[in-house]
């Protein structure tokens, strides 16, 4: 409960101050350089994936369509927080308006909720492709793909809307200093003058149920996939199937391990996990998957790598010919 009635407009600060990574201020410049390099890599890699898939009609299969959406979500997630982080680390520009802070919180958490759903749909795609190859096109029709994508998005919005409403109706009458590099829910909740436990419990239980159910279904899919793969008579076919799935497993590990570590480190508190470790984990969580996903999929998926290379050559030579 929020307790007694509050005049919300009087208890809303004009802005918050993001402190970056507490205790590592001396390393902020090096962190800014590293984050900038990773962000540029993420933007280029994910944009190339979206473009290569979008422009080639032969790559409109479910796996590539889901990968295209994943790349777009990674761009949104990284772009929601990294530019402001770099600004804080480089120039000390730590101020962020109240509305911008809550918008940032909404989009970064929405993107993470969409991404876990996408990883589940991609696991289902691999399950159908390997365990039911003859029925692949009949099961994963464009209508089914659209329905799955819509369901993932609606679930994420349904999860985030109550959380945003609860946070937006908390009074912030004390300090406006956010001990974090971006407007993460739990860091903002600690500044509230009223009891933040309802929103914090909703966030923890909701995200645990969402991620837990997705991981359970993904694990079940891969158990069935491995059984089907090892039943194949050809070693070459086994290796090809395992190689295709390996990239997906790598992407899942990059997403779930730092994500869950970040969530539970924040809940354990700084008596167990130092505050700078909590913030650094949360920062890396929003940029590392976006940076490495295109590299993993590009290097492990020969067709996609060829498509990206073909698009780059076409882009470079066409422009050089126009220039001459």
From Swiss-Prot:
GO MF annotation list: G protein-coupled receptor activity; olfactory receptor activity
Membrane topology: Multi-pass membrane protein
GO cellular component: plasma membrane
Chief site of localization: membrane
Residues passing through the membrane, by range: 30-50, 59-79, 104-124, 144-164, 201-221, 242-262, 279-299
The keyword Transferase belongs to this UniProt entry's keyword annotation: no
Subcellular location: Cell membrane
Protein's name according to its UniProt entry: Olfactory receptor 52I1
